[in-house]
C-alpha cells in the first residue's frame, strides 16, 4: 500500500515555504510521492536535497490536470480529501484503515492551498476533517498520517541516509556521513 499526496494549488512566492513543508511532512510521515499542480523549481530542489541527505525514496511530480490524476488513481485506490468541513477524524479513521486493509488499495490524500473545487469533495471516497477550526494543511496532513500509520513512521530511518539523528534526553546526537 502506497500513500500519495495531491496538493491542489500553489501560489508561487506566497506558498513556497508552506509547500516545501507539505512535501517534507509527507515524506517524513510515510508518503511515497507528492503531486503538485504547478511547477516550482525551488520546492522541488529543496525536497530533492532533503531526500539526498536523509535517505529513502520520495517522488515529486507535477501534473497538468489534478482531476484526471485523481480519477485515474481512484480506479485502483482510495481518495481522502482533508478538509475542515469533512467527517470527524476520530469517528472515521478506523473505517478508512479497514477499507484500505481489506482492499489493499493505495491511498491518495488531497489537500488544498486555496479554495478547493467542489469536484474534489465529490470525487473523494472520504472527506475528512482534522478539527473544525482554521489551521494549516501541514497540521492536518501530519495528524492524518500519524493516526493512519499509528505512529509507525515517526522514527523512520533509511540505509542510504547521510544524516541520522538518534533521540536523546539531554544532547543533540547527529551522525553525518563524511564524503
Swiss-Prot record:
Taxonomic superkingdom: Archaea
Keyword ATP-binding: no
Catalytic function, reaction form: cytidine(56) in tRNA + S-adenosyl-L-methionine = 2'-O-methylcytidine(56) in tRNA + S-adenosyl-L-homocysteine + H(+)
Broad class of the protein's primary localization: cytoplasm
GO cellular component: cytoplasm
One Pfam family here: Trm56
Keyword Manganese among UniProt keywords: no
UniProt xrefs under InterPro entries: Alpha/beta_knot_MTases, tRNA_m1G_MTases_N, tRNA_mtfrase_aTrm56
Compartments where found: Cytoplasm
Residues given in the record as S-adenosyl-L-methionine binding sites: 82, 112-116, 130-137
HAMAP family in UniProt: tRNA_methyltr_aTrm56
Annotated function: Specifically catalyzes the AdoMet-dependent 2'-O-ribose methylation of cytidine at position 56 in tRNAs.
Protein family per UniProt: Belongs to the aTrm56 family.
Assembly information from the UniProt record: Homodimer.
Protein name, as recorded: tRNA (cytidine(56)-2'-O)-methyltransferase
